[in-house]
Amino acid sequence: MPWRRRRNRVSALEGGREEEAPPEAAAVPPALLTSPQQTEAAAERILLRGIFEIGRDSCDVVLSERALRWRPIQPERPAGDSKYDLLCKEEFIELKDIFSVKLKRRCSVKQQRSGTLLGITLFICLKKEQNKLKNSTLDLINLSEDHCDIWFRQFKKILAGFPNRPKSLKILLNPQSHKKEATQVYYEKVEPLLKLAGIKTDVTIMEYEGHALSLLKECELQGFDGGHRKPLFAIHWSVQRLFTGMQTLEPSVVCVGGDGSASEVAHALLLRAQKNAGMETDRILTPVRAQLPLGLIPAGSTNVLAHSLHGVPHVITATLHIIMGHVQLVDVCTFSTAGKLLRFGFSAMFGFGGRTLALAEKYRWMSPNQRRDFAVVKALAKLKAEDCEISFLPFNSSDDVQERRAQGSPKSDCNDQWQMIQGQFLNVSIMAIPCLCSVAPRGLAPNTRLNNGSMALIIARNTSRPEFIKHLKRYASVKNQFNFPFVETYTVEEVKVHPRNNTGGYNPEEEEDETASENCFPWNVDGDLMEVASEVHIRLHPRLISLYGGSMEEMIPK
């Protein structure tokens, strides 16, 4: 039966290991199928040509600079035989989709590394439905040691020539994430793929809130000079410093956890970048871009950032994006008050969203889902509008403004027109990313992109409790959640939220379980509680951090 024909395109880049492939590796993945690009193939320079058994067919295999192509070797048949022509159709995989190569051997129980050579196994990244990626294998069977050695070395050389894929990763793992399942997720699903790709790893367990911040702000990552360090890595990076230069000294950073962990690590990397640039971290108008790319493995009870980045909260997909070196530049916000930086972040909610999180934090002994549901119900029962003054700078997409922003000009110093609204607001959301999640499959801000240089300002004015609940329920449906008379949306570059309540937050004497400290207002910033007593100024900074992942169409060209 002929294979199903489909072309799988996944952008990629990088390296592998010389370990042997397991003998049970799959023969031919059904997704590696035929391509009609004969003219392109003819134009490519051929590196190697040989005969391998693929599936059950002996094939003429050609390795070019861009792809591996094969065609079954068949006896001559009369021209025009459609079944014969179909069987002899050329198939291919692009080299950029390969992330590892191994020698395939048949080993007995007592044998560890030696055994009868069977051929070569290629490990490939394929695109599935709904933004998912999967790893697959292709076996090239040939019993000749010399023949396989030549091909194996050529594949290794090709993989080593992909510079954007990480060679070493600093793993920050939050063992408390999602019912303490993050550790199991990493060691059972993530680490085997990283080892297969030949990526060195160093794992640090995040033992307390703020651990990642203190670690990444101070440590020298290239030496892994902290807890759980491996001395050989320091030698490895010292050698790289001599022969490859500073740009390859530091490994990429990967966070295994939920939104709280991911936001903390991103904040730490950005603070580290400002410190390295000699900037005053308390007052930052034009922050510099983080030097180290960040990978996010979704392993928390909420994975909004990873879900928005990858389009799906899928561990294997996130891991393969890291291995293949798929990088996205993502917009980041700064949150400041009275001119002092509070933190970097991607999204924030004030009002109902902030109070709900503050309530949930008081019941951490509950399971994450129970805590969230309980907090939502209680916040709805005590629904209260905040008297606010909101100023914002509308997004200007003109070329001259974008050029000025790219050069680092503070937007507040430009001759732009601020707008102001005031009144009673149930909720205020400011989001630089779509904020996809299980309760909002289309996103809390579905019209926002990861790096379009703007934020979504979503305001819910005071209304009845039933109407506000209808608005919340719309997030889980396909209907427009903003199609209510009390909901307003704006596309902005900067926002200032100034609460005008004199009491500030909740009155401690009014209820025993107040949701904020006295004279402070609760903010939900990337799932973390931030309590502020005065005006908060949110600025957007385009493409400030590099994250592994993103849709195929939005990835940075290699």
Curated annotation (Swiss-Prot):
InterPro entries from the UniProt entry? ATP-NAD_kinase_N (IPR017438), CERK_C (IPR045363), Diacylglycerol_kinase_cat_dom (IPR001206), Lipid_Phosphate_FormReg (IPR050187), NAD/diacylglycerol_kinase_sf (IPR016064)
Q: Where is this motif: Nuclear localization signal 2?
A: 102-106
PANTHER family assigned: CERAMIDE KINASE-LIKE PROTEIN, SPHINGOSINE KINASE
Region of interest (Disordered), ranges = 1-36
Q: Which organism is it from?
A: Homo sapiens
Q: Name one Pfam family in it.
A: CERK_C
Q: How is it modified after translation?
A: Phosphorylated on serine residues.
Gene3D superfamilies documented for this protein: 2.60.200.40, Probable inorganic polyphosphate/atp-NAD kinase, domain 1
Q: In which tissues is it expressed?
A: Isoform 1 and isoform 2 are expressed in adult retina, liver and pancreas as well as in fetal brain, lung and kidney. Isoform 3 is expressed in adult retina as well as in fetal lung and liver. Isoform 4 is expressed in adult retina, lung and kidney as well as in fetal lung and liver. Moderately expressed in retina, kidney, lung, testis, trachea, and pancreas. Weakly expressed in brain, placenta and liver.
Q: What is this protein called?
A: Ceramide kinase-like protein
PROSITE patterns per record: DAGK
What gene is this protein a product of?
Answer: CERKL
GO MF? lipid kinase activity; sphingolipid binding
Medical condition linked = Retinitis pigmentosa 26: A retinal dystrophy belonging to the group of pigmentary retinopathies. Retinitis pigmentosa is characterized by retinal pigment deposits visible on fundus examination and primary loss of rod photoreceptor cells followed by secondary loss of cone photoreceptors. Patients typically have night vision blindness and loss of midperipheral visual field. As their condition progresses, they lose their far peripheral visual field and eventually central vision as well.
Q: Source organism lineage?
A: Eukaryota, Metazoa, Chordata, Craniata, Vertebrata
**Keywords in UniProt for this one?**
Cytoplasm, Disease variant, Endoplasmic reticulum, Golgi apparatus, Nucleus, Phosphoprotein, Retinitis pigmentosa
As for what it does, the entry says: Has no detectable ceramide-kinase activity. Overexpression of CERKL protects cells from apoptosis in oxidative stress conditions.
As for subcellular location, the record says: Cytoplasm; Nucleus, Nucleolus
Residues in DAGKc domain copies: 164-339
Sequence motif Nuclear localization signal 1, location on chain: 2-9
Q: Name one GO cellular component term.
A: perinuclear region of cytoplasm
